[in-house]
Amino acid sequence: MKIYTKTGDKGFTSLIGGTRVAKHHIRIESYGTVDELNSYIGLICDQDIALHDKQILKQIQDRLFTIGSSLASDPEKSKMIIPDLHLTDIELLEKEMDMMNADLPELRHFILPGGSNAISFCHIARCVCRRAERITVQLAGESTVDEKVNIYLNRLSDYLFTLARKIANDNKIPENQWIPRV
């Protein structure tokens, strides 16, 4: 299978189902941003973090491929069976956050990104996740998007924030608290 097809050379690409759209179409922007997020999560996995966290992140990467496939499909034409996102996927993120938060100091200030590469990559992924969520919410206003996708992305950004705090705590790295000037 060739990687290049030359069919996108004029600025158009195909959705799953065959519909041709401009490469700047919001549906392309949505799944492209999810793909970008998945790459950053891979970067977090490459850091020296707890094995359990890596295992959860690998599950998240799998779910992001599910989301990307769903977003890359023309809801009117796709006959391909796309894996579904389940409520249990969202519940897993919530359960993991609850477990991490049980061991973290109470959050009293905003946290500035930084402290280590792993922490910073979590914050970058969190920001990309928020962007993916904004784009898919916009897409949902124009086309069919499974509502669990936006819920998952919302929880995932919270999970990534909490994971950044956990990594700081695990490595005894003080959190960079934002103390506003008055």
Regions found by a protein language model. Give the residues of each.
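Phosphate/pyrophosphate-binding loop motifs in nucleotide- or prenyl diphosphate-using proteins
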Residues: 1-182
